[in-house]
Amino acid sequence: ERIYPAAGGGHQIVTVPCSGVRKGAERTVAVADGVVYYLGNDGVYAFDGSMPVCVSRALGDKRYTGGVAGGESGRYWLSAVDAAGETELLVYDTQKRLWHRQDNTAAVAFARWNGEMTVLCSDGRLLDTSGTLGTAETGFSWSAESGDLGLYTPEHKYLSRLELRLKAAAGSTVKAYVCYDGDNVWEQVGGVSGEAGQT
Protein backbone atom coordinates (compact mmCIF):
# COMPACT_ATOMS: atom_id res chain seq x y z
CA GLU A 1 0.00 0.00 0.00
CA ARG A 2 1.13 3.51 -0.72
CA ILE A 3 0.22 6.58 1.29
CA TYR A 4 -0.16 9.89 -0.52
CA PRO A 5 -0.25 12.73 2.04
CA ALA A 6 -2.16 15.90 1.27
CA ALA A 7 -1.68 19.34 2.83
CA GLY A 8 -5.42 19.62 3.55
CA GLY A 9 -5.46 16.34 5.47
CA GLY A 10 -7.17 14.29 2.75
CA HIS A 11 -4.51 11.61 2.71
CA GLN A 12 -5.01 8.70 0.34
CA ILE A 13 -4.04 5.07 0.73
CA VAL A 14 -3.73 3.26 -2.57
CA THR A 15 -3.41 -0.52 -2.73
CA VAL A 16 -1.19 -1.73 -5.55
CA PRO A 17 -1.29 -5.48 -6.27
CA CYS A 18 2.23 -6.86 -6.68
CA SER A 19 4.18 -10.02 -5.92
CA GLY A 20 5.41 -10.24 -2.36
CA VAL A 21 7.58 -12.70 -0.47
CA ARG A 22 6.60 -16.33 -1.05
CA LYS A 23 5.13 -18.07 2.00
CA GLY A 24 7.95 -19.89 3.77
CA ALA A 25 10.64 -17.88 1.95
CA GLU A 26 11.00 -15.07 4.47
CA ARG A 27 14.71 -15.88 4.95
CA THR A 28 15.37 -15.00 1.29
CA VAL A 29 14.86 -11.28 1.98
CA ALA A 30 18.19 -9.44 1.80
CA VAL A 31 19.48 -6.00 0.86
CA ALA A 32 22.20 -5.49 -1.74
CA ASP A 33 23.18 -2.02 -2.99
CA GLY A 34 20.14 -0.42 -1.34
CA VAL A 35 17.68 -2.74 -3.12
CA VAL A 36 15.59 -5.39 -1.35
CA TYR A 37 15.73 -8.82 -3.02
CA TYR A 38 13.43 -11.72 -2.18
CA LEU A 39 11.94 -14.95 -3.50
CA GLY A 40 8.37 -14.49 -4.72
CA ASN A 41 5.91 -17.07 -6.06
CA ASP A 42 7.33 -16.99 -9.57
CA GLY A 43 10.93 -15.89 -9.16
CA VAL A 44 13.37 -13.57 -7.42
CA TYR A 45 12.25 -9.95 -7.16
CA ALA A 46 14.08 -6.66 -6.66
CA PHE A 47 12.26 -3.85 -4.83
CA ASP A 48 13.83 -0.39 -4.95
CA GLY A 49 10.93 1.48 -3.35
CA SER A 50 8.73 1.77 -6.43
CA MET A 51 7.46 -1.57 -7.80
CA PRO A 52 8.93 -5.07 -7.40
CA VAL A 53 10.53 -6.37 -10.60
CA CYS A 54 11.30 -10.03 -11.33
CA VAL A 55 15.04 -10.36 -12.00
CA SER A 56 15.31 -14.14 -12.32
CA ARG A 57 13.86 -14.85 -15.78
CA ALA A 58 17.36 -15.84 -16.96
CA LEU A 59 17.27 -18.84 -14.59
CA GLY A 60 14.61 -20.50 -16.76
CA ASP A 61 11.37 -22.14 -15.72
CA LYS A 62 12.68 -23.77 -12.54
CA ARG A 63 10.65 -22.74 -9.50
CA TYR A 64 12.06 -22.44 -6.01
CA THR A 65 10.02 -22.89 -2.84
CA GLY A 66 12.31 -21.37 -0.24
CA GLY A 67 15.85 -20.83 0.88
CA VAL A 68 18.21 -18.49 2.66
CA ALA A 69 19.84 -15.34 1.28
CA GLY A 70 22.39 -12.68 2.04
CA GLY A 71 23.27 -9.38 0.43
CA GLU A 72 26.48 -7.46 0.03
CA SER A 73 27.80 -4.73 -2.21
CA GLY A 74 27.21 -5.92 -5.76
CA ARG A 75 25.86 -9.38 -4.97
CA TYR A 76 22.70 -11.15 -3.81
CA TRP A 77 23.46 -14.68 -2.56
CA LEU A 78 20.59 -17.18 -2.57
CA SER A 79 20.76 -20.78 -1.40
CA ALA A 80 17.50 -21.78 -3.09
CA VAL A 81 15.47 -24.94 -2.50
CA ASP A 82 13.23 -26.37 -5.24
CA ALA A 83 10.06 -28.50 -4.90
CA ALA A 84 12.12 -31.72 -4.86
CA GLY A 85 14.18 -30.45 -1.91
CA GLU A 86 17.32 -29.95 -4.01
CA THR A 87 19.49 -26.92 -3.18
CA GLU A 88 21.36 -24.57 -5.51
CA LEU A 89 23.62 -21.71 -4.52
CA LEU A 90 22.80 -18.81 -6.85
CA VAL A 91 24.55 -15.45 -7.03
CA TYR A 92 23.05 -12.38 -8.69
CA ASP A 93 25.53 -9.71 -9.78
CA THR A 94 23.53 -6.53 -9.17
CA GLN A 95 25.82 -4.36 -11.31
CA LYS A 96 25.96 -6.57 -14.41
CA ARG A 97 22.52 -8.12 -13.81
CA LEU A 98 23.86 -11.63 -14.33
CA TRP A 99 22.99 -14.84 -12.47
CA HIS A 100 25.62 -17.44 -11.59
CA ARG A 101 24.84 -20.99 -10.48
CA GLN A 102 27.66 -21.83 -8.06
CA ASP A 103 26.98 -25.36 -6.81
CA ASN A 104 24.58 -27.25 -4.53
CA THR A 105 25.79 -25.71 -1.26
CA ALA A 106 22.97 -25.82 1.29
CA ALA A 107 23.32 -22.67 3.39
CA VAL A 108 21.84 -22.23 6.85
CA ALA A 109 22.72 -18.54 7.11
CA PHE A 110 24.65 -15.71 5.48
CA ALA A 111 26.44 -13.06 7.54
CA ARG A 112 28.92 -10.23 7.07
CA TRP A 113 32.06 -10.63 9.16
CA ASN A 114 34.94 -8.15 9.03
CA GLY A 115 33.51 -6.75 5.81
CA GLU A 116 33.33 -10.16 4.11
CA MET A 117 30.28 -12.30 3.31
CA THR A 118 30.42 -15.67 5.03
CA VAL A 119 28.15 -18.68 4.53
CA LEU A 120 27.27 -21.17 7.25
CA CYS A 121 26.55 -24.49 5.49
CA SER A 122 24.21 -27.23 6.69
CA ASP A 123 27.21 -29.58 7.10
CA GLY A 124 28.87 -27.13 9.53
CA ARG A 125 31.40 -25.60 7.12
CA LEU A 126 31.93 -21.84 7.21
CA LEU A 127 32.73 -20.45 3.76
CA ASP A 128 34.18 -17.09 2.78
CA THR A 129 32.81 -15.73 -0.51
CA SER A 130 35.65 -13.27 -1.14
CA GLY A 131 38.45 -15.83 -1.21
CA THR A 132 40.52 -13.91 1.35
CA LEU A 133 40.09 -16.44 4.16
CA GLY A 134 41.04 -20.12 4.13
CA THR A 135 43.00 -21.87 1.39
CA ALA A 136 42.72 -21.22 -2.32
CA GLU A 137 40.94 -23.91 -4.30
CA THR A 138 42.51 -25.69 -7.23
CA GLY A 139 41.22 -25.62 -10.80
CA PHE A 140 37.65 -26.73 -11.42
CA SER A 141 35.23 -27.20 -14.29
CA TRP A 142 32.50 -24.66 -14.91
CA SER A 143 30.19 -23.53 -17.69
CA ALA A 144 28.36 -20.44 -18.92
CA GLU A 145 25.19 -20.61 -20.99
CA SER A 146 23.50 -17.80 -22.88
CA GLY A 147 19.82 -17.56 -23.61
CA ASP A 148 18.38 -17.94 -27.10
CA LEU A 149 20.29 -15.67 -29.47
CA GLY A 150 18.59 -13.75 -32.26
CA LEU A 151 15.18 -15.36 -32.05
CA TYR A 152 13.48 -12.55 -30.20
CA THR A 153 14.58 -9.62 -32.32
CA PRO A 154 11.90 -7.84 -34.34
CA GLU A 155 13.37 -9.30 -37.54
CA HIS A 156 13.68 -12.88 -36.11
CA LYS A 157 17.20 -13.11 -37.51
CA TYR A 158 19.41 -16.15 -37.06
CA LEU A 159 23.09 -15.79 -36.27
CA SER A 160 25.59 -16.78 -38.92
CA ARG A 161 28.66 -16.24 -36.72
CA LEU A 162 29.31 -15.90 -33.00
CA GLU A 163 32.59 -14.59 -31.59
CA LEU A 164 33.70 -15.15 -28.02
CA ARG A 165 36.46 -13.11 -26.42
CA LEU A 166 38.04 -14.50 -23.30
CA LYS A 167 41.28 -14.75 -21.41
CA ALA A 168 41.96 -18.34 -20.45
CA ALA A 169 44.51 -19.07 -17.74
CA ALA A 170 47.69 -20.85 -18.82
CA GLY A 171 47.08 -24.60 -18.94
CA SER A 172 43.30 -24.30 -19.01
CA THR A 173 41.00 -25.57 -21.76
CA VAL A 174 37.91 -23.86 -23.13
CA LYS A 175 35.37 -25.66 -25.30
CA ALA A 176 32.45 -24.03 -27.13
CA TYR A 177 29.19 -25.88 -27.72
CA VAL A 178 26.04 -24.80 -29.56
CA CYS A 179 22.48 -26.05 -29.52
CA TYR A 180 20.42 -25.33 -32.63
CA ASP A 181 16.72 -24.47 -32.57
CA GLY A 182 16.19 -25.64 -28.99
CA ASP A 183 16.66 -29.36 -29.73
CA ASN A 184 18.73 -29.87 -26.52
CA VAL A 185 21.56 -31.59 -28.41
CA TRP A 186 24.82 -29.75 -27.75
CA GLU A 187 27.53 -29.93 -30.44
CA GLN A 188 31.15 -28.94 -29.82
CA VAL A 189 32.10 -26.31 -32.42
CA GLY A 190 35.45 -25.12 -31.14
CA GLY A 191 37.98 -25.00 -28.38
CA VAL A 192 41.23 -23.43 -27.26
CA SER A 193 43.94 -24.13 -24.68
CA GLY A 194 45.11 -21.22 -22.56
CA GLU A 195 48.61 -19.86 -22.98
CA ALA A 196 50.31 -17.09 -21.01
CA GLY A 197 49.26 -13.64 -22.22
CA GLN A 198 46.82 -14.97 -24.83
CA THR A 199 43.31 -13.55 -25.24
Task: Map each language-model feature to its residues.
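Surface-exposed extracellular loop regions of Gram-negative outer-membrane beta-barrel proteins
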Residues: 1-17
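Beta-sheet repeat architectures centered on beta-propellers
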Residues: 21-35, 41-199
